[in-house]
């Protein structure tokens, strides 16, 4: 969170490459102790915050270096489905369980991001965690559209009113509806929303 306070050192922080892992460090899923909920939250942040996201191959099917942590050969293992001897084929989506869910999750998130102007052209404002709420919030916004990401890393669920953050950037209307990017439903930003432990809300809002 506080790394952003050094953004002034760079001519254009929005054009810096950001990543969760790469070929020289343990894979994200392993770093997160194979916690799928943390993995989803981490990628929601990566694909929403400022910068150009880099997603290492195999991330979308939860590849891990747990068998030999940090080993370069393990970090750069073949993507499953590229060889006749592979029992699964992620190239054709012939995978199951969490791997399939992760692939669909990332596909949905990336397709949404592709045409989301606030992510590509907008400003960023964040609300660092406090001892009272223990949640982290970022907003990406342009004149007529805003993206809100609320992350709850606490052990307890949190109650959040999206308008409390949105109105600090631009006043909203009564009964203003935002779109939940993950659940694909509408949310009244003036209502209290429960965010479970180790979970997040990603909302897309038009003015």
Task: Please tell me what each predicted stretch does.
Residues 5-7:
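Active-site neighborhood of glycoside hydrolase catalytic domains
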Residues 165-184:
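Solvent-exposed beta-hairpin/edge-strand motifs
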Residues 10-170, 195-196:
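Loop/helix patches that line or flank the sugar-binding groove of alpha-linked glycan CAZymes
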Residues 141-143, 182, 206-207:
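Short, flexible beta-strand-to-coil junctions
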Residues 103-107, 181-187:
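Extended, compositionally biased low-complexity polar/Lys-Gly-rich tracts
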